């Protein structure tokens, strides 16, 4: 999908012979849409498509199969993701399927971007049947050794230096993620993680204030027991409690709660057992909230 900037967004579609209800999926920071599918036919996107859904997996600008890839000349950030990339993806699904109900699934920071989009463009709320967020948090308040290493050391010290040297954040080369971020997107997301204020640095739009005035679609917040930093269960709950009025469901994937494993931030979507464990519950949730 071409953007006015000249960039091209990739929207990967997984569907059966007769497309079912549409599901739009959005990845988080320092990653791309491959968190939802693999070349070997695994992943939540493929699982849902095999069970009757018409699935669209987005790669935000410069990530995954979108082009051109992020480099030192890239000037966009999460403001553009919220105001340009996500609207383009939503409208693409509408153009293909008509103005029918969509359901949205996100991993990590993708949930923050989806909620920010709905806060800024509430006219789209009526289009969304439900939201499913895996490991989505906006702030990190938990304290442990992994937080010190991954956030206080790597995210707040190593990443700014890498941005200065490379002109962007080469997360894959640093082995802290699967895709790159621009300097702007890094700085904007880092500010939201650190501060209570949920405000756009470009124009001052107050997402936190706007979202409190809205009734969002039913939302399922899924955390993982072994996600110690990037989507700690307490931080996921904090995001849920700050994200407006909605029918809420909160789950921690753990052996204690009947799951096969104590999953982490990535394996909650990539573990081979997920298809037998919690993916069927996600499938049932989406079926229950499909109002066609």
Where are these regions (language model features)?
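Short beta-strand/loop motif that positions the catalytic acidic residue
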Residues: 221-223
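The feature captures the conserved acid-bearing segment of alpha/beta-hydrolase catalytic domains
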Residues: 206-215
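Catalytic active-site module of serine/aspartate enzymes centered on a nucleophile-bearing elbow/loop
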Residues: 248-292
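Alpha/beta-hydrolase-fold enzymes
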Residues: 95, 99, 104-105, 109-202
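N-terminal cap/lid segment of alpha/beta-hydrolase-fold proteins
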Residues: 1-16
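Short, surface-exposed "cap/lid" segments of acyl-processing enzymes
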Residues: 15-69
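Conserved alpha/beta-hydrolase "acid-adjacent" motif
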Residues: 228-235
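Alpha/beta-hydrolase active-site loop
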Residues: 75-94
